């Protein structure tokens, strides 16, 4: 056996990426060479064998030993002659050849699959036409060496044709590359490169993407779109000729970088650039993968020209080439992150200048790429040719892009080249990226001009009251008024306001609880010609005082009990109002004018002081008239007033019903926070129209069951949402429960409530592809503009800043002309008009609607858990003596950065007093407030937070915490505990002196658990599994298992009972799916209250119930006996996934037959056996979906060691799946007379399958929660972000 070598250069990243991926062949590279001419196929086959033998990396074998990976050249390996296939008589030779090659690429070709890592075929498709198919694993070759091997084989073939000897190998042994690489790691050059890239990393702008989907650190896909662009019309050649002082490669790069920047709407972004990493190195003539993708900061200035950008980028690359040997993964690790963190860069750029041509006499050769490895986002390969033309190959991740979008992007690139060719001195900021017709398309969307009457709110209401004087108008729990009676009250109160000195143009503050008197007060203020200023009495006194000081209202309307809160506000006249007035028979005042301010609403300000937004009468009149036209109310409608009056959505609730003859009913104060109270309110008053903010709609939906939805929501005809992004899944759940049409509205406080609309039900909802419903189309007399950083309109599909124009814009900020001027700017497209910048990011969709993409935030995911860093920051800032606080996710020790997501949350605190903080006590407080996955594992006190040059927080400069020895409890005992503590310390980078130290609490994670198990297996000369580490994660517990009886310890985690968590309260029993294992249910511990115990019930092999039973009833009976041993009497709480749900339902029925109480039955995408054709599945063997589940199980529980353990585990899983299919062929359901909670995986739901119909014969009552995921993902941490809280809430009830 030859020398064992470590993985170097690109190999470690490829190895780890494949290990962490479920993709079967993503790391294979393949192409075929189309040979046209006379080919001696047997001779070429001999040349292939000879050529492959000359490249030692093609004979590499790989082995994993104690968590380390080694490679060695298998000198005994002899390549077989490639198969020669003749398809000339086939009906479609080309299509058949393509199918053969794709079939090879669809296999499991992972490095440990047992399949050949090198494969060639010679396929004849015509008399003088051959396809020479070549496929390699990426661990063996890269994009430089792949064609080099092909050329050498062609050279050998030509020599054999001439009767000459086989040419000598031109390839350097890869051992030389490894040795050189290891020497580099110990050299001063390494130190210089590390310093260079540390500085580059600090200056690097964020990555960008052409896709609206967020960039993930590790989301590569082998499902790739390929688009080849040929710029052979002479325009690139013309441009290059005019710019003769610029290299064509530099010009091509600048064009691509500029094009990407404009389509991303980012003038500063990070791209990846592929470096050969070969010049001046042994790797120059080696065949292993050494290409390096390094981050390139792209900075585009509006006032520079394309040649200036090209020259600057060329200078950057020249400097980077001196440091190109430094691994990209090491740059990430140096910054305290793991390779799966947020990516360093987005699109990858590659200039391909190496030769793909083959010189074979009498034969033309053309290479066709089939697979180049996975793509994270987008890759651009630039091919400037010797004729002066340019071709570009685009590779795009299909999860993020579709072909029509890419083709449209390509058209914009052609247009850019044409513009620069016509004027090489054109400034980057003056380039137009809109295609012909797109300006007209946007103009059509914004053609919203509708003539409205010159009127006011009070005039509109008075007009309607005259039409329907005796119709019911306004009611709460104590009072009811007709339209006539309401107008009498309004006029009486308006006269009273006049008596208190209120004049037209004044403002009047209102601090009233929700009741009819609040509505009457607002109408009376408008009647008197003033503007209302709503005060939320739930606000702190200081905030209310600030608002009153800024607004200086002429009067405050409030109640006796609230009056003392305003006693120290100077010069404030007040009126207490809480009872009907005696009508005086006075004539209407109607003193408002269209130019008057209608209302003032305060919003939070960046300075910490709220700012008042003034909205005019004409603006809100336009909004209400549009709404009545678009969603007409009648005298039969009942509108709910439940929105707090300080939220501008309340405006249409207070006035819209009264311009349409409808009735407004007032919810009780604070009722809007109580979903059950709102259900009763809707049912009692027969509400037809209401509003929810999406978060409250989610809470309301969670409170509904199909029965209560029918009972309490039957009268709802139209429901509106605004205030937050509206999740599409929530809309689907609402539609399923109630059927009431849902409408999404959007608008900032600065623009009369709402400026756009979109249906969130029916066909429009079905067509939504994003996670949230679009904000839609503009309302009457309103324009939506999406502009880039240079104030140019962006084309459809491109993200930009959202601006608003038109009649509904607010008048400005109260007393803040400077702020008004900065936010309400001149419209550059319509002279004399204003435009408001919302601060929201959006894009146009193909249907002309606007999609909201969000604002900048601090959201991230760590090992499947979504985390808002800002939420943690706010909790930390509330801690005693903390002046500033920020949370950061980073890798605390480099041992954890070897693969997977090794990040931990670190809290950085600045003391207000300057004295040392008791971080241990503060950490304990955080644990009481935050869920475990959001509590920082370390708190670090800093004298001040690091700031960047522009004064913003510099997260990259936050120091990594040093792991120090924790305060010891009981010291580890000599022997096993000491060995285990030392293993913890070596892997986690900290001193472990406590026998109760927990591996995961110290920063360990599942991937490190594999390494720990391998290390302990070696030290104790017996098998220790990752499962044992997971269920016994402290030093003492793990020592007890290892020192115990060998077979039982070996099987820890593989027994019938799997204790997932111990608590002092009730137990949730979780039944295994078809795999036989219940380990997946460990995710529940993140969501259930600590008092709950969680126990998994499994079917191990051999002798498990699934293997020994003849039918499913016997499995149920066996598990029932196990359950009764654990808990003889109820109440019982049962949960099952897939087959486990079938078992849980059958056991629940048997428990009820015994007279026991089943308090909870949860089913995760479970269906009665009667709904599936299991006989057909058994006859046909395991289908692809079942095999996909087997692989998912295998990946989830794969042991650290190669060999018997993982093989045994996989055999167990596969055997249990086969038994499951066998048992289900004869299974029948047993009726359960209780209630069940069913979670449905929508993406894999069979067409026409109704959960209600499927389960109605077998379950008495069913609550259904639909999830946007596939069957195999419903148990995943991501899916449980929604499922976990629902289960928690249901169990707590």
UniProtKB/Swiss-Prot annotation:
Residues 1066-1293 are annotated as: Thioesterase. Binds 1 phosphopantetheine covalently. Pathway: Siderophore biosynthesis; enterobactin biosynthesis. It catalyses: 3 2,3-dihydroxybenzoate + 3 L-serine + 6 ATP = enterobactin + 6 AMP + 6 diphosphate + 4 H(+); holo-[peptidyl-carrier protein] + L-serine + ATP = L-seryl-[peptidyl-carrier protein] + AMP + diphosphate. GO terms for biological process: amino acid activation for nonribosomal peptide biosynthetic process; enterobactin biosynthetic process. Its EC number is 6.3.2.14, 6.2.1.72. PROSITE patterns: AMP_BINDING (PS00455), CARRIER (PS50075), PHOSPHOPANTETHEINE (PS00012). Involved in the biosynthesis of the siderophore enterobactin (enterochelin), which is a macrocyclic trimeric lactone of N-(2,3-dihydroxybenzoyl)-serine. EntF catalyzes the activation of L-serine via ATP-dependent PPi exchange reaction to form seryladenylate. Activated L-serine is loaded onto the peptidyl carrier domain via a thioester linkage to the phosphopanthetheine moiety, forming seryl-S-Ppant-EntF. This is Enterobactin synthase component F. It comes from Escherichia coli O157:H7. The gene is entF.
């Amino acid at each position: 056996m030859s020398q064992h070598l470590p993985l170097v250069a690109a190999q470690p990243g490829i190895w780890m990426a494949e290990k962490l991926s479920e993709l079967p062949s993503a790391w294979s590279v393949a192409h075929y060479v189309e040979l046209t001419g006379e080919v001696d196929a047997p001779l070429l086959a001999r040349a292939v064998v000879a050529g492959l033998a000359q490249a030692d990396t093609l004979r590499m074998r790989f082995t994993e030993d104690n968590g380390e990976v080694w490679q060695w050249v298998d000198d005994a390996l002899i390549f077989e002659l490639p198969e020669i296939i003749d398809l000339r008589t086939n009906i479609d030779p080309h299509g058949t050849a393509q199918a053969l090659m794709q079939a090879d690429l669809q296999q499991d070709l992972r490095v440990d699959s047992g399949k050949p890592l090198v494969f060639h075929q010679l396929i004849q498709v015509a008399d003088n036409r051959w396809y020479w198919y070549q496929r390699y694993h990426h661990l063996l070759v890269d994009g430089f060496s792949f064609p080099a091997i092909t050329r050498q084989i062609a050279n050998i073939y030509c020599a054999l044709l001439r009767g000459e000897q086989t040419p000598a190998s031109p390839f350097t042994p890869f051992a030389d590359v490894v040795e050189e690489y290891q020497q580099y790691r110990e050299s001063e050059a390494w130190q210089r490169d590390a310093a260079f890239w540390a500085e580059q990393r600090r200056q690097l702008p964020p990555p960008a993407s052409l896709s609206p989907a967020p960039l993930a650190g590790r989301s590569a896909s082998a499902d790739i779109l390929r688009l080849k662009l040929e710029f052979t019309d002479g325009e690139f050649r013309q441009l290059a000729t005019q710019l003769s002082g610029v290299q064509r490669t530099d010009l091509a790069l600048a064009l691509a970088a500029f094009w990407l920047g404009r389509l991303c709407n980012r003038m500063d972004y990070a791209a990846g650039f592929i470096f050969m990493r070969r010049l001046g190195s042994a790797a120059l003539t080696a065949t292993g993968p050494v290409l390096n993708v390094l981050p390139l900061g792209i900075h585009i200035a509006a006032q520079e020209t394309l040649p200036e950008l090209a020259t600057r980028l060329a200078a950057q690359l020249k400097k980077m080439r001196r440091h190109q040997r430094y691994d990209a993964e090491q740059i990430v690790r140096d910054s305290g992150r793991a390779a799966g963190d947020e990516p360093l860069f987005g699109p990858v750029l590659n200039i391909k200048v190496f030769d793909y041509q083959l010189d074979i006499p009498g034969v033309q050769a053309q290479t066709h790429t089939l697979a180049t490895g996975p793509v994270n986002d987008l890759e651009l390969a630039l091919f400037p040719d010797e004729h002066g033309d340019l071709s570009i190959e685009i590779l795009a991740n299909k999860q993020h892009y579709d072909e029509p979008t890419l083709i449209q992007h390509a058209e914009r690139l052609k247009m850019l080249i044409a513009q620069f060719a016509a004027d090489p001195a054109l400034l980057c900021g003056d380039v137009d990226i809109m295609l012909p017709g797109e300006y007209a398309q946007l103009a059509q969307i914004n053609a919203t001009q509708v003539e409205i009457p010159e009127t006011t709110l009070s005039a509109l209401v008075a007009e309607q009251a005259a039409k329907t004087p005796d119709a019911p108008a306004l009611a709460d729990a104590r009072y009811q008024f007709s339209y006539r009676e309401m107008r009498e009250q309004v006029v009486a109160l308006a006269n009273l306001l006049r008596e208190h000195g209120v004049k037209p143009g004044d403002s009047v503050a209102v601090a009233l609880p929700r009741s009819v008197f609040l509505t009457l007060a607002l109408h009376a203020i408008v009647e008197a010609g003033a503007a209302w200023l709503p005060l939320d009495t739930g606000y702190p006194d200081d905030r209310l005082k600030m608002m009153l000081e800024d607004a200086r209202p002429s009067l405050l309307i409030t109640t006796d009990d609230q009056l003392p809160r305003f006693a120290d506000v100077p010069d404030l006249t007040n009126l207490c109002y809480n009872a009907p007035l005696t009508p005086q028979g006075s004539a209407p005042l109607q003193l408002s004018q269209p130019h008057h301010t209608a209302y003032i609403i305060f919003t939070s300000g960046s300075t910490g002081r709220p700012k008042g937004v003034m909205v005019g009468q004409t603006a809100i009149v336009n909004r209400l008239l549009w709404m009545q036209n678009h969603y007409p109310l009648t005298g039969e409608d009942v509108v709910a007033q439940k929105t707090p009056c300080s939220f501008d959505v309340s405006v249409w609730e207070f006035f819209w019903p009264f311009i349409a003859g409808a009735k407004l009913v007032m919810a009780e104060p604070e009722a809007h926070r109580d979903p059950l109270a709102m259900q009763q309110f809707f049912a009692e008053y027969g509400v037809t129209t209401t509003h929810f903010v999406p978060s409250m709609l989610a809470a309301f939906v969670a409170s509904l069951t199909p029965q209560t939805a029918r009972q309490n929501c039957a009268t709802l005809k139209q429901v509106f949402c605004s205030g937050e992004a509206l999740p599409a899944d929530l809309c689907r759940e609402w539609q399923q429960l109630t059927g009431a049409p849902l409408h999404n509205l959007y608008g900032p406080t600065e623009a009369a409530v709402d400026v756009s609309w979109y249906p969130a039900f029916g066909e429009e909802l079905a067509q939504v592809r994003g996670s949230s419903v679009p904000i839609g189309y503009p309302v009457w007399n309103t324009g939506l503009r999406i502009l880039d950083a240079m104030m140019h309109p962006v084309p459809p599909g491109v993200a930009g800043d959202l601006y608003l124009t038109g009649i509904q814009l607010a008048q400005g900020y109260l007393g803040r002309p400077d702020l008004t001027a900065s936010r309400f700017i001149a419209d550059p497209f319509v002279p004399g008009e204003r435009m408001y910048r919302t601060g929201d990011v959006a894009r146009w969709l193909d249907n002309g609607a606007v999609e909201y993409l969000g604002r900048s935030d601090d959201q991230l995911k760590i090992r499947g858990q979504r985390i808002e860093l800002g939420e943690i920051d706010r909790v930390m800032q509330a801690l005693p003596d903390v002046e500033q606080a920020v949370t950061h996710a980073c890798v605390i020790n480099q041992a954890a950065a070897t693969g997977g997501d090794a990040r931990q949350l670190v809290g950085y605190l600045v003391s207000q007093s300057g004295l040392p903080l008791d971080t241990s006590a503060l950490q304990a407080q955080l644990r009481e407030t935050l869920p475990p996955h959001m509590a920082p594992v370390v708190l670090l006190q800093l004298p001040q937070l690091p700031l960047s040059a522009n004064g913003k927080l510099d997260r990259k400069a936050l120091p990594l915490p040093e792991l120090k020895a924790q305060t010891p409890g009981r010291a580890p005992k000599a022997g096993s505990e000491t060995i285990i503590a030392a293993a913890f310390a070596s892997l986690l980078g900290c001193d472990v002196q406590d026998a109760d130290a927990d591996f995961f609490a110290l920063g360990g994670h599942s991937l490190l658990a594999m390494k720990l198990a391998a290390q302990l297996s070696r030290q104790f000369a017996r098998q220790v599994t990752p499962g044992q580490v997971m269920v016994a994660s402290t030093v003492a517990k793990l020592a007890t298992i290892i020192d115990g009886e060998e077979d039982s310890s070996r099987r820890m985690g593989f027994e019938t009972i799997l204790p997932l968590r111990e608590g002092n309260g009730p137990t949730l029993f979780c039944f295994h799916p078809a795999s036989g294992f219940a380990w997946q249910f460990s995710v529940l511990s993140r969501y259930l209250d600590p008092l709950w115990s969680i126990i998994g019930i499994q079917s191990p092999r051999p002798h498990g119930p699934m293997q020994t039973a003849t039918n499913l009833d016997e499995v149920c009976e066996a598990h029932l006996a196990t359950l009764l041993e654990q808990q003889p009497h109820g109440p019982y709480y049962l949960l099952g996934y897939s087959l486990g749900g079938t078992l849980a339902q059958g056991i629940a029925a048997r428990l009820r037959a015994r007279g026991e109480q089943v308090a909870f039955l949860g089913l995760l995408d479970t269906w009665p056996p009667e709904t599936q054709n299991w006989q057909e599945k058994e006859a046909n063997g395991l289908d692809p979906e079942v095999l996909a589940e087997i692989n998912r199980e295998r990946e989830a529980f794969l042991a650290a060691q190669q060999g018997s353990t993982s093989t045994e585990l996989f055999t167990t899983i596969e055997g249990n799946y086969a038994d499951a299919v066998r048992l289900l062929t004869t299974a029948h359901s047993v009726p359960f007379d209780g209630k069940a909670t069913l979670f449905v995986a929508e993406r894999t739901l069979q067409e026409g399958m109704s959960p209600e119909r499927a389960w109605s014969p077998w379950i008495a009552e069913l609550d259904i929660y639909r999830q946007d995921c596939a069957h195999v993902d419903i148990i995943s941490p991501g899916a449980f972000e929604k499922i976990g809280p629902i289960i928690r809430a249901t169990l707590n009830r």
